[in-house]
């Protein structure tokens, strides 16, 4: 099999970054992050960037926009394509690492996404709709590509409907010739739960609460921070006095466990729809296992892929 993209996916706290960086180091590769939150500058501990692990390995799609900027899957796909072409033109191997299923699939499925323009007529039509009616309309549209947070905010919900009902003109295929080799890291559930809890304790010790305070001090409202993921949501509520530190920890820990389950469900759905994932045992030696699989594979000749 020829491949021109390595992919490392898995639930949170599974060890994706470490494996992805080590494979990139051994195969003269560069990492492309597929994480919807690591794009934001200043959100380091809460998003688990772990930049110290990269060393000399170049990385892309991390720290590229400021908090407050509405980054989405459409822009991710556009920037991924630019970075991918830049990497392959220099004869390097792209290594995509991440756990945001929507971002991963926007690359692996090969469909080109388009930025949907605002529809003033539709917005006027939806202006009088209740939140429940908007949710029902979005559900009827059966969209594949909207964030779960869209259901929490009225403006985002209207935008999600706008995207779901948009009829896009024909587009050129996304990265024709893309041939990914996909690894997934899996753990027994009790061990993964333990890893999540231990990592949360470590991040709090590293200053995650202070990170949220600094972001708020720069002018980002707590209400906005709540949309940047579980860590920022529960810590913001703690800083507002709505949760004690212990309650914040317990609720956040439980929410991250639930999030990991949803990630695994997403990956299972990807497999049911034809995505081939080579699962590695996180508790054993995932690097050695990956190298064993790679020894039977071949990369395409340089450049790996030039659309």
Curated annotation (Swiss-Prot):
Q: What is its EC number?
A: 2.5.1.75
Binding of ATP, residues: 10-17
The coenzyme or cofactor needed here is: Mg(2+)
The broad enzyme category this protein falls into is: transferase
Mention any Pfam family matching this sequence.
IPPT
Query: What are the GO MF terms of this UniProt record?
Result: ATP binding; tRNA dimethylallyltransferase activity
UniProt catalytic activity = adenosine(37) in tRNA + dimethylallyl diphosphate = N(6)-dimethylallyladenosine(37) in tRNA + diphosphate
Q: Which GO terms describe its biological process?
A: tRNA modification
Query: Which residues of the sequence carry a binding annotation for substrate?
Result: 12-17
Keyword tags: ATP-binding, Magnesium, Nucleotide-binding, Transferase, tRNA processing
Subunit and interaction comment: Monomer.
Q: Which family does it belong to?
A: Belongs to the IPP transferase family.
HAMAP family tied to this protein? IPP_trans (MF_00185)
Name of the protein: tRNA dimethylallyltransferase 1
């Amino acid at each position: 099999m020829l491949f021109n993209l390595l992919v490392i996916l898995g639930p949170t706290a599974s060890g994706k970054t470490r494996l992805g960086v080590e494979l990139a180091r051994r195969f003269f590769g560069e990492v492309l992050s597929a994480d919807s939150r690591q794009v934001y500058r200043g959100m380091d501990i809460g998003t688990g960037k772990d930049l110290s692990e990269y060393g000399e390995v170049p990385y892309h799609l991390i720290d590229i926009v400021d908090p407050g900027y509405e980054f989405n899957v459409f822009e991710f796909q556009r920037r991924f394509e630019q970075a991918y072409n830049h990497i392959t033109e220099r004869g390097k191997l792209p290594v995509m690492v991440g756990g945001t299923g929507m971002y991963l699939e926007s690359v692996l499925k090969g469909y080109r996404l388009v930025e949907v323009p605002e529809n003033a007529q539709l917005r006027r039509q939806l202006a009088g709709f209740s939140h429940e009616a908007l949710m029902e309309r979005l559900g009827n549209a059966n969209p594949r590509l909207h964030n779960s947070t869209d259901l929490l905010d009225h403006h985002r919900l209207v935008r999600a409907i706008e995207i779901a009902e948009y009829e896009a003109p024909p587009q050129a295929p996304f990265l024709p010739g893309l041939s990914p080799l996909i690894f997934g890291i899996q753990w027994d559930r009790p061990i993964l739960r333990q890893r999540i809890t231990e990592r949360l304790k470590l991040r709090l010790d590293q200053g995650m609460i202070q990170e949220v305070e600094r972001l708020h001090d720069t002018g980002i409202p707590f209400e906005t921070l709540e949309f940047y993921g579980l860590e920022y949501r529960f810590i913001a509520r703690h800083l507002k006095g709505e949760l004690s530190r212990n309650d914040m920890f317990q609720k956040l820990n439980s929410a991250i466990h639930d999030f990991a389950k949803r990630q695994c469900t997403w990956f299972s759905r990807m497999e049911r729809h034809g995505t081939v994932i080579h699962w590695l045992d996180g508790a054993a030696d995932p690097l050695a296992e990956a190298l064993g699989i790679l020894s039977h594979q071949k990369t395409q000749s340089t450049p790996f892929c030039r659309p």
